[in-house]
């Protein structure tokens, strides 16, 4: 998988006759598509009847693709179990939180924990891996397809049994569970693990501990399913393994990718939401650090299903997406899908070719993206992304806690993307990292919206501050235990103890007309907030209006050579945005953050390092054009011309600049 940038598409040869297949492959080669993904929905083609397995068709397709200089990522087809596995067997099906049993006719309809499903999954994967695993054209494997895309936690009888076993392994005794969960509330106390319900229908809300733990249980079982598939494949193939995921789905990415070889994700962000696209790149670059990520699916024009559709991309945006993904650490930029499907629930979806074989509306943009790939490939292969000095922690566990306790519709993905977007617009080069990621090389660390911070993370972040880093914790951070209960020793538990503050109380500030002042700016305060008595720490932000007037909402605590800054509330509105930018600028300067560029909003700078020095890849994402100011002189590597000062870009344009070491 080394030595090139990939430009690919998801391909469904099993849906078309041989003439169409041959023409598709010829056209792919002609326009520069050099990799395809196949097989993820083809279980019934591979095993039309129980035990009658034949994957020869796909082996032949891989050979034919290779003959045309196109490489293949092969998938396991477990997202779409065939009718013979599900018909007449409701016990094998996914059951949602309403207690509704899923039927055949879509995808992800079976329970992935059912032992018979697991048995048949292992068997079909073994056959695929044995026949295809050593083919020269095979360069990678994708497990399943978008775990938990359409379904959340399953509450079938199989999962009930596994849930009880999971709880017993975690808590050892039922008394420990009762104590940890506080089941004395509403007389929920259990006498044995078998009595603990799943989060099915109830008159009101479930216990927070039960709801959160069930989601974590579900995530653990999906990771187990992935490990099981990977073990089968590795017995017959050395090709690297991935899974195409998304931060939208109910999986623990840190755990899931421990057993996989490279990270890949699917994204359908619009130009108006390009910050979500860039957030993904900055996150997935760090999920398997040091290894390029893949965009396994994105639309060449627009996404659609029978029930909805998105607006087509503006001309030029696809090129900007492709270049930014390569510049930010990606090795592949792939479309869903090559040829429009003539049937099924996604038949309206945008594609490279229409169902009748003509170029679709995004076709010219695909050609433009390919020209860009060819133009920047040699530079990307000779350089690598520069680690940021600023890090934002992403946590799937935090996502779970906010799903259990969303207050008034809070959504973790929205909150964390908005927080990230502020750094992006300020021109600060940033990494989005996982809870378990090392903090070496960072100077400024943000941990927003993480209700529960594990002791190991707090110890690591405190050591980071001791050695000179600045850790900004909050808002909505540290206020819950690992069991999703409230601390009883102090408001923010271990975080409070290392930050030098005393939490007086926590309450929602959104509708209490609360406001505060910090860094010379007065702004409304929002979200469920923590109010501090500064004590021996420095009060940086004070509440001036509302029930907690006169108390602190931002504090600063000296910690070794660095600092721990507590952000107890979220400044809101236009004034809040100004306050947050001042806070970030202040602590970035104090931490010695140098990776900051003077770039217009809507344009991104991706710094890379190579043998010749520092390279900036500058891309306009918003289609309005933009500019970046160089600190000194540079060379435009695409034109060979010297550049200095203010460098402008047209709509969706990109520049690749080698910075001079002599300013």
UniProtKB/Swiss-Prot annotation:
Assigned keywords, A-Z: Glycosidase, Hydrolase, Metal-binding, Zinc
One Pfam annotation reads Glyco_hydro_42M
SUPFAM superfamilies the UniProt entry points to: (Trans)glycosidases, Class I glutamine amidotransferase-like
What is the recorded function of this protein according to its Swiss-Prot or TrEMBL entry? May play a role in the degradation of rhamnogalacturonan derived from plant cell walls.
Q: Provide the assembly information.
A: Homotrimer.
Q: Which family does it belong to?
A: Belongs to the glycosyl hydrolase 42 family.
Q: What is this protein called?
A: Beta-galactosidase YesZ
Gene that produces this protein: yesZ
